[in-house]
Design a protein with these regions (language model features):
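Haloarchaeal acidic low-complexity proteome signature biased toward cell-envelope/secretome components but also
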Residues: 1-33, 137-144, 221, 226
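Conserved P-loop
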Residues: 35-133
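Hydrophobic anchor at the start of a short beta-strand
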Residues: 64, 186, 205
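Short beta-strands and strand-loop turn motifs
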Residues: 66-68, 154-159, 189
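Conserved nucleotide-binding/hydrolysis micro-motifs of P-loop NTPases
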Residues: 71-74, 101-102, 160-161, 192-195, ...
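Phosphate-binding/switch loop-helix module in NTP-utilizing enzymes
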Residues: 105-182
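Sensor-1/coupling segment of RecA-like P-loop NTPase cores
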Residues: 176-195
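Phosphate-binding/switch region of NTP-binding enzymes
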Residues: 192-227
Length: 227
């Protein structure tokens, strides 16, 4: 082996480092939260991106809550969506769903029931925003606190899909955005149509665009990737 080969091997070894031991997660107050994020598009990854941010924030000790508008509703959701089990194991991260049994217009639920569930979820979001506004924002929110004590990051998953489908009024969603406290990070996901009504209120707008998707070739949703 030449000196050059040894240098390359040494450089490769040096580039691989053991991860540090995980530290206990202590509740903390975010210093730079308060933006509105919009994730929309016909590609896969909108919910996944929101969940990733949620886990990242919770890893810093921030209180995160996921409210899903168009998902859930099975007798045992923990056996259906892997993220629910992961959230349950993560301090400072919680979730709830609207109890939809599948996607709007795909199963047998009537239109009125879908709209009622979406409106119920929006009312729940209002409650959480109000609770956060009334909370003591100078002190960390305990990781095991009920979300009604306030949250640092609120993920409204598929809320934009619900507005696209006409299940909730876009003006009601705008009112929710206007009512949020300045230090609450609000993440909105869903929908294949650009939500023009909300983009001028957002600090971040990301379009997730599909180029190729296995569903187009007949591949069903896979456990561990789609749920």
């Amino acid at each position: 082996m030449t000196d050059a080969d040894e240098d390359v091997e040494a450089a490769g070894d040096a580039a691989i480092e053991e991860p540090p031991e995980p530290r206990p997660i202590e509740p903390a107050v975010p210093e730079e939260f308060g933006l509105v994020q919009v994730w929309w598009g016909d590609g896969k990854g909108k919910t996944t991106a929101a969940l990733g941010m949620g886990f990242r924030a919770a890893g810093h000790g921030y209180r995160v809550h996921l409210l899903q508008f168009m998902k859930g509703g099975t007798p045992s959701v923990e056996n259906v969506r892997g993220e629910y089990n992961a959230i349950a194991a993560m301090p400072g991260f919680s979730y709830e769903t609207t109890g939809h049994y599948g996607w709007h217009r795909r199963l047998d639920d009537v239109e009125d029931e879908h709209a009622a569930r979406a409106e119920s979820a929006l009312e729940r979001a209002r409650e959480l925003v109000d609770a956060t506004r009334d909370a003591d924002r100078d002190s960390p929110i305990p990781s095991d606190a009920d979300p009604e004590m306030g949250v640092d990051m609120l993920l409204l998953d598929e809320v934009l899909y619900a507005t696209n489908r006409g299940l909730i009024d876009p003006d009601d969603l705008l009112a929710l955005i206007d009512a949020k406290p300045g230090d609450l990070e609000l993440v909105l996901t869903g929908g294949h149509e650009r939500p023009e009504y909300v983009t001028d209120r957002a600090d971040l707008v990301s379009e997730v665009r599909k180029e190729v998707h296995p569903i187009d070739a007949g591949q069903a949703a896979r456990k561990g990737t789609e749920y």
